[in-house]
A protein has these predicted regions:
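C-terminal accessory/tail domains of diverse enzymes
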Residues: 2-114, 126-341
């Protein structure tokens, strides 16, 4: 079984798949859990990329789930075969969460993955102003060390190419203790200088100018997204600055088809965006911010409790930094449950 000739990206197939998915949307059943999660995520859209090693899902099933099969060269086998990656259309709200629930079941039943695979999360409807971009970049640099303790060591030090590197300190906005006391001119200068450094990093060596800027959204590196080195960090700002769909991509997660892990990761990353949006004064003035602080601030202690428990469980699981990824891990992924919500 196969899909014939596939492309390496999903953009061209999104309109068709979205149209078919929407024609089935009245049949999507929403549970109380789906509704609760969607309320926490608010107005953000979300799309996921599930890398696999083996498996096949027929088009009638894919279309109902808003899934698009693509090729991923990073997964190429020694035989030359390129396994499939399954990419969702942009999803939103309780029906989007319900769809992820259904996708989780189908992927678990029909696909397998290994250590070379990942799950990537795109979140859309995010702010695009310079203040947010600077705040988000600095926040992710602040939490990345703690975030990596929730994943096995191979995500930090893979054998081959690292597709989810840590953000470099060179491009991070400086901590500024008197942020609240800056006048408008000082604030504009701080944000502008910070943004220009981030733009230089994301554009792979260009400061904003007439040819390359936020309005024309042209990336200096042409000839395929895989040539853009700034994509391959634990958070990817390239689509936010240079693509029409304006999303942030979170690339760190290990491969999974487990709905508990998917939902928790979506809530954790959404919380990062909310915190960077509403509390830039805290981001710019503090050198240390914990994930627990962020979750409590964004969701409130009662709603955050289960997500914090999940984070602690992940840290405990990988405290010995076990690197193997065999049948034990695949079975754990299939059967893992935690009443987070």
């Amino acid at each position: 079984k196969g899909y014939g000739s596939l492309k390496y990206g999903s953009d061209g197939a999104i309109p068709r798949t979205t149209y078919i998915y929407n024609s089935y949307s009245s049949q999507i059943k929403v549970s109380k859990e789906h509704f609760r999660i969607s309320k926490m995520i608010k107005n953000y859209s979300f799309g996921l990329e599930f890398e696999t090693r083996n498996g096949y899902i027929s088009y009638p099933i894919l279309d109902k789930l808003g899934l698009i099969p693509v090729k991923d060269g990073s997964l190429r086998l020694p035989s030359g075969k390129v396994p499939y990656e399954f990419v969702t259309i942009p999803l939103k709200g309780a029906k989007g969460i319900s769809t992820l629930d259904s996708i989780s079941k189908v992927l678990t039943e029909r696909t397998t993955f290994d250590q070379k695979c990942s799950m990537h999360l795109h979140i859309g409807n995010v702010p695009t102003d310079k203040m947010f971009i600077c705040s988000m970049f600095k926040l992710m640099h602040t939490v990345q060390k703690e975030l990596l303790t929730m994943f096995p060591e191979y995500k930090s030090f893979p054998e081959g190419k690292n597709y989810a590197k840590k953000l470099k300190k060179d491009f991070v906005p400086n901590t500024i203790l008197n942020f609240k006391n800056l006048n408008k001119l000082e604030l504009d200068e701080y944000i502008s200088a910070s943004f220009n450094r981030i733009y230089y990093f994301v554009s792979c060596g260009q400061y904003p100018n007439q040819a390359y800027n936020r309005k024309n959204r042209v990336h200096p590196i042409m000839g395929g997204k895989w040539n853009i080195s700034s994509r391959y960090y634990l958070i990817n700002f390239v689509p936010l600055l240079f693509k029409d769909f304006k999303t942030l991509e979170f690339r760190l997660h290990t491969p999974t088809s487990n709905k508990t892990k998917i939902f928790n990761w979506l809530l954790i990353c959404s919380a990062f965006i909310e915190y960077a949006t509403h509390y830039p004064d805290l981001v710019f003035t503090k050198n240390t911010i914990t994930i627990e602080e962020i979750l409590n601030k964004v969701y409130g202690k009662e709603k955050a409790k289960g997500i914090i428990e999940y984070c602690s469980l992940r840290k405990g699981l990988f405290s010995d930094q076990k690197d193997s990824f065999g049948e034990e891990e695949r079975m754990e992924d299939k059967n893992f449950k935690l009443n987070t919500f």
